[in-house]
UniProtKB/Swiss-Prot annotation:
Domain of life: Eukaryota
Name the UniProt record assigns to this protein: Rho-related GTP-binding protein RhoA-B
InterPro entries named among the record's database cross-references: P-loop_NTPase, Small_GTP-bd, Small_GTPase, Small_GTPase_Rho
Residues listed as glycosylation sites in the UniProt record: Y34
Residues with a covalently attached lipid (S-geranylgeranyl cysteine): C190
First-listed, main subcellular location of the protein, grouped into a coarse class: membrane
Cysteine methyl ester found at: C190
Protein family (similarity comment): Belongs to the small GTPase superfamily. Rho family.
Gene, per the UniProt record: rhoab
Organism in which the protein naturally occurs: Danio rerio
Membrane topology: Lipid-anchor
């Protein structure tokens, strides 16, 4: 039996952990060097609820320079991973300010999983010290859940690509969302004669 194919697009601020999350999930290795992404694609197989699913993973650039290029990755998307970094409250603020309007414009009705990346840094001393200097603190789990409700996300997950904590669960939830969304969608294809 052929695998079901689904397209996942990951969005969020530059350096919030999108690429690391995709690489750890698809290749099981953590990239130690940060190289800003323009566009990358990965493929990974996952089994969810006894269904074999081939996930096409579309990585995108979070930097503003690519705001006009990014929409090219949106057509035919089945699920969106919208990411912020737990060590960057500013990246959470950009979820309703920038990412939700963009995604809802280009991908209406596509389920969104809100993902808090870099969970391992929430209790990291150095991270806490640096944020305190700016009168900030790491994003709390409740703040992430509240934001997911606010933007109407399918779900909220936290993970650490570095420790692999929660990584598989993020993609299991995303795959379930993609499978449910397809079932619920009415066909709006028309035939021109």
């Amino acid at each position: 039996m052929a695998a079901i194919r689904k397209k996942l697009v990951i969005v969020g601020d530059g350096a919030c952990g999108k690429t690391c999350l995709l690489i750890v999930f698809s290749k099981d290795q953590f990239p130690e060097v940060y190289v800003p992404t323009v566009f990358e694609n990965y493929v990974a197989d996952i089994e969810v609820d006894s269904k074999q699913v081939e996930l096409a993973l579309w990585d995108t650039a979070g930097q503003e320079d690519y705001d006009r290029l990014r929409p090219l990755s949106y057509p035919d998307t089945d699920v969106i991973l919208m990411c912020f970094s737990i060590d960057s409250p500013d990246s959470l603020e950009n979820i309703p300010e920038k990412w939700t309007p963009e995604v809802k414009h280009f991908c209406p009705n596509v389920p969104i999983i809100l993902v808090g990346n870099k969970k391992d840094l929430r209790n990291d001393e150095h991270t806490r010290r640096e944020l305190t200097k700016m009168k900030q603190e790491p994003v709390k789990a409740e703040e992430g859940r509240d934001m997911a409700n606010r933007i109407g996300a399918f779900g909220y997950m936290e993970c650490s690509a570095k420790t692999k904590d929660g990584v598989r669960e993020v993609f299991e939830m995303a795959t379930r969302a993609a499978l449910q969304a397809r079932r619920g969608k009415k066909s709006n294809k028309c035939c021109l004669l």
